[in-house]
Design a protein with these regions (language model features):
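Non-catalytic cap/lid and distal C-terminal segments of serine-dependent acyl enzymes
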Residues: 1-268
Length: 268
């Protein structure tokens, strides 16, 4: 296993940035084809070190790339000028192609995230479907409808108006904006474009459970194929470690198959 910590100057973020990359010792088991690549997006208050990327890379023989998104919700923040979505979906993809020969096409490039990173994975995949062919999102912070119409001085117990305004822009119009994954995926469907294969999960004891159920229902009502799974679990690394392995197996391993809508029975 090769572990690399790579530093380069990001035009999207206007500073030097660092990402972690893991390459399996065995390399690519599919002959001369380029190695498949998985992007891992961390959650709120986290960083690239939150992931056990080396375990996934070694077991399934793909490259793992873990960037740092700070607390920016992996969005192009209109108020801050920090373009985290552009950084991942354009700049980092192109850097990996030029420098390492990775992430060459959507069929072999996937993105996965948990919590804030789950939101970011869905949003990034829908914003750049030509780059990402599959997306896995765990315990996703799908909070658009909660923060819509928040007023200055208000807080939801996690963060305040100023923070959300910095990440999402105008909260009066956020539900119909480019920051909303629902808007992006619906546009792909309406325009007849390829939608990335979608894998989602959430724990039945997770405080974001209803948010994830609502997005699952939206995808069903919009007739967008996806897999949605629930099982006992909280908003923590135990659940994310279990499902990162499960989804990697489904996306890369012996359980690979055509995605169709599927959900397990709800509990409680």
């Amino acid at each position: 296993m090769s572990e690399l910590s790579v530093k380069f100057f990001s035009e999207a973020l206007k500073r030097n940035v660092r990402f972690e990359m893991y390459l399996p010792d065995a390399g690519n088991h599919e002959g001369n084809r380029k190695m498949k690549t998985l992007f891992l997006l961390h959650g709120y208050t986290g960083d690239a070190d939150n992931w056990a990327g080396e375990e996934l890379a070694q077991k399934y023989h793909f490259a793992v790339v873990a960037p740092n998104g700070e607390n920016g919700f992996w969005l192009d923040g209109p108020a801050t000028g920090h373009k985290f979505c552009t950084y991942v979906g354009v700049e980092l993809v192109n850097y990996l192609r030029r420098t390492f020969g990775l992430a060459m096409n959507a069929d072999e490039t996937y993105v996965m995230g948990f919590s804030m990173g789950g939101f970011g994975a869905l949003h990034t995949a829908f914003a750049f479907p030509e780059c990402f062919g599959k997306v896995a999102a765990m315990s996703s912070a799908l909070i658009i409808h909660e923060i819509a119409h928040m007023k200055p001085g208000e807080s939801n117990g996690v963060a305040n108006y100023d923070y959300y305004h910095g990440c999402f822009g105008d909260l009066e119009t956020v539900e119909t904006s480019e920051s909303n994954p629902e808007v992006l995926v619906k546009r792909l469907k309406d325009n007849g474009r390829q939608i990335p294969e979608i894998f989602m999960s959430c724990g039945t004891e997770d405080f974001l459970l209803e948010n994830n159920r609502a997005f699952h229902q939206y995808l069903e009502e919009t007739d967008i194929s996806h897999i949605y799974l629930e099982s006992k679990g909280e908003h923590n690394m135990d659940f994310w470690k279990e499902y990162s392995a499960k989804f990697a197996k489904m996306m890369f391993g012996e359980e690979r198959k055509k995605v169709g809508t599927r959900s397990i029975p709800r509990h409680g």
